[in-house]
Amino acid sequence: MNNHIEALSYYLGAFVDELTRLNVCDVVISPGSRSTPIALLMEQHEGMNTYLHVDERSAGFFALGIAKAKKRPVALLCTSGTAAANYYPAVCEAFHSRVPLIVLTADRPHELRDVGAPQAMNQFNLYGTFVKQFTEMALPEASEAMYHYARMTTQRMIASACLAPQGPVHLNFPVREPLIPDFSLESLWDKGRGEYTGVVQQGNVVMPSEYVDSLVGRLSHMEKGLIICGDDSHSEIAAFATQLAEKTGYPILADPLSNIRSGHHDKTMVIDCYDTFLRNELLKETWKPDVLIRFGGMPVSKALTQFIKKQTKAVHIVVDESGQWRDPALVATEVVQASDIAFCSALIEKMPVMKKNDWFRMWQHINEKTKETLREMETYDTAFEGRVITDIVRVLPEGATLFASNSMPIRDTDSFFFTSDKNIQVMANRGVNGIDGIISTALGASIICDPLVLVIGDLSFYHDLNGLLAAKLHELNITIVVVNNDGGGIFSFLPQYEKKEHFESLFGTPIGLDYEHVVTMYGGSFSRVNGWEQFREEVQKGATTEGLHVVEICTNRDENLTLHRTLWAKTQDVITTSLQGESK
């Protein structure tokens, strides 16, 4: 018995210690029995920050949020059985959004598998193709070789999570009872520890000089180019992309998640209203780029994606450090395996300065005309969902974070988050674009990003109500703006809206909940606003005071649809008139 406890303590102690040596210092723990030894050791280790979350689905997204904000791996621990299965949605999102998670699941030992033991199921490769690597850890054993094995496996798995493309990995730990480690053991954290920690260093991919010279030569003869920046984790991309745009004369179509629309950098070349004006048929038929250079994930804008698809005669260059083909438009002609920074730097160094021509001035002119028209909605007294975004940005302080939920909030952010000299970070879950786990992801991010304002629809809010517990348990600061249109507002913009007979029951899905009671149950403050002045006051108050603050603004789905369509129609008229004037 003592030999078992000693082996358990030293073996798992070596594993936990190696996590911290490799800078994995945050773990989200869901309580359970079989995971007891790992949980206790993590709580005991002075280098580990532990966060408790009793709902595994919310816990997974909470860890995801911390990892997204810190831009480094975060561990996630649960017991055996369906607890592990509840991590699945967050693991899928982490995989597709390239966020490193270290998923740790406790398990029954081999003799208790497939024999009807309680809380035992097959956890081998549980997450399938949605993790970069899976390993079944050996049972604890008291030997130097096994202590070293625990550390080396940790090193390999973290390296896998961090190498491009980043993503989740899964370690499954079978353990036998008794499960309580012995903290009185001498040198508990030192077993298997060498003088040096094995770390896999990722170098920069160097583009062949022949390719760079060839590309510079080609681009020098292509006046009509576009730089498209999607969701990106590189904080320096704004400076490099704008320098490249200045050299080439190509406008930057900046997705809000690129974080190029706001900040202290020069935004002369940044186009922010393309989602609206690329709906114009005359423009789409007459504006034909020679080359498109795309960084990061695919943009949120459907109008931009459709525009990209139609450019079948253009050169399409997709820059991706992992070399993966993120090209749902199916038009890429070249995929460059290099970091965005390395690619931009190479071109900036060798590209001659190309004069800003009529091509850039056309994009800039139409962008400004579009923005002028869109800003008319700031005079609307009615509860227009697009104005939610502009009014939040108006009152957010320097250095704040705006987290946009999926469905309508991220689309309104795309349409109405205009360029700003304030440094405002925009975040979202755009891996698989689900509405689950949004509250938890934002709360995880709020540990690092303070102040943080989450904009979320009422159905998405309902979907992750359990996530609010983290705000109470860990005394987190967050302001949540609930845009309550009593249902799935996005479906009003889709063809399903025309099927009136079944629309409300299948797609509109009103649930008629009063969220005030839930918010107060979790120790938060709740306000239901009437009017834009009160809305701005409540958001500003929430962003500057501690705790959980929920601000609800009620909107009407049909009215919101009409306002969007009216604004789009007016914008299209302005654009068409402007284009026809230029052609005379």
Curated annotation (Swiss-Prot):
Name of the protein described by the UniProt record: 2-succinyl-5-enolpyruvyl-6-hydroxy-3-cyclohexene-1-carboxylate synthase
Cite the NCBIfam families for this sequence. menD
UniProt xrefs under SUPFAM superfamilies: DHS-like NAD/FAD-binding domain (SSF52467), Thiamin diphosphate-binding fold (THDP-binding) (SSF52518)
Q: What class of enzyme is it?
A: transferase
Give me the comment on cofactor binding: Binds 1 thiamine pyrophosphate per subunit.
Q: Name one GO molecular function term.
A: magnesium ion binding
**Could you tell me the keywords of this UniProt record?**
Magnesium, Manganese, Menaquinone biosynthesis, Metal-binding, Thiamine pyrophosphate, Transferase
| Subunit and partners | Homodimer.
List the GO biological process terms.
menaquinone biosynthetic process
- Matches recorded under InterPro entries: DHS-like_NAD/FAD-binding_dom (IPR029035), MenaQ_synth_MenD (IPR004433), MenD_middle (IPR032264), THDP-binding (IPR029061), Thiamin_PyroP_enz_TPP-bd_dom (IPR012001), TPP_enzyme_TPP-bd (IPR011766)
E.C. code: 2.2.1.9
Q: Which reaction does it catalyse?
A: isochorismate + 2-oxoglutarate + H(+) = 5-enolpyruvoyl-6-hydroxy-2-succinyl-cyclohex-3-ene-1-carboxylate + CO2
- What does the protein in this record do? Catalyzes the thiamine diphosphate-dependent decarboxylation of 2-oxoglutarate and the subsequent addition of the resulting succinic semialdehyde-thiamine pyrophosphate anion to isochorismate to yield 2-succinyl-5-enolpyruvyl-6-hydroxy-3-cyclohexene-1-carboxylate (SEPHCHC).
So which domain of life are we looking at? Bacteria
What organism does the UniProt record list as the source? Answer: Bacillus cereus (strain ZK / E33L)
Cofactor(s) demanded: Mg(2+); Mn(2+); thiamine diphosphate
Give the family from UniProt: Belongs to the TPP enzyme family. MenD subfamily.
Pathway(s) it belongs to: Quinol/quinone metabolism; 1,4-dihydroxy-2-naphthoate biosynthesis; 1,4-dihydroxy-2-naphthoate from chorismate: step 2/7; Quinol/quinone metabolism; menaquinone biosynthesis
